[in-house]
Amino acid sequence: MHLKGRSMLTLLDFAEDEIKFIVDTALQMKRENYAGRRYWGLLEGRHLALLFEKPSTRTRVAFEVAASQLGMSVSYVTKSDSQLSRGEPLKDAARVLGRYVDAIAARVKRHEDLETLVEHSGVPVINALSDKFHPTQAIADVMTILEKLGRVRGVKIAFVGDGADNVAHSLALAATSLGADVRIVTAPGYEPLDAVIAAAEERARRSGGSFELVYDPCKGVKGADVVYTDVWVSMGLEAEREKRLRDLRPYQVNSELLKCVGKDYIFMHCLPAHRGEEVTEEVLESSRSVVWDQAENKLHAQRAVLALLVP
């Protein structure tokens, strides 16, 4: 399957078979990496720009390591240390970066800024997190589910917390594409974007999976194979902190809520975790938690995305 030259702003732009191909490639590259068969030099001579407007630990380092492993060189640029901080239009910066580099991975406050980069740079742009989507995280998430449970089709995934979260959006699109039964367990007013709901329902219909919104936290996690949460106060939403903590408190993933599952399950979190808010220390550090393996898979997912998209 040929994906060279494509951008990845959202998984809405990728068909179900393309998402499966990316996940399968990431798993294959991970296995071969551990077997000593490396992909060093696959993108020798290419250059990646990391254009980050928000802080990052895992995503930034994973892109830097993945690019290096593939033979790429990397330039890390933040808004504060570039002319963007002095008012240079993003489209002007995009025009120049597109003449210097072979691809851009960008972490932005406004998803629309990614579209500006695509329009004016002329090179593949990869969403390293926006206010609406986090597609490379979803690739890592599906990888983790496949590794831990052996399948995605028919797996019951309960995402608990802020249903309008960028990770929730991308997970719903990726998992329903591969036949999972996805529940977004959230409070009224925190539902996913209408476009995400419509796309997830359509993908679930085609794949044999399902998608639903559940407002009761105990009912939402009942029978789940995967219980997943993310922070309640995403970057840029700090002004809403107290309201969000109050509204989402009943959706904390703790030992009491997990009694409602009633079966074996795994716990997932994209990190960083705010212990005592969306999840308790006990759950995060439990034997059912796979968050550290999940975090490692960000490296393998992002390496596959670079290998497949960068010309």
From Swiss-Prot:
Binding residue positions for carbamoyl phosphate: S56, T57, R58, T59, Q83, R107, H134, P135, T136, Q137, C270, L271, K298
Pathway involvement of the protein, from the record: Amino-acid degradation; L-arginine degradation via ADI pathway; carbamoyl phosphate from L-arginine: step 2/2
GO molecular function: amino acid binding; ornithine carbamoyltransferase activity
Keywords: Arginine metabolism, Cytoplasm, Transferase
Chief place where the protein resides: cytoplasm
Binding residue positions for L-ornithine: N166, D230, S234, M235
InterPro entries: Asp/Orn_carbamoyltranf_P-bd, Asp/Orn_carbamoylTrfase, Asp/Orn_carbamoylTrfase_sf, Asp_carbamoyltransf_Asp/Orn-bd, Orn/put_carbamltrans, OTCase_ArgI
Entry keyword annotation includes Transcription regulation: no
Record-given protein name: Ornithine carbamoyltransferase
Gene that encodes it: arcB
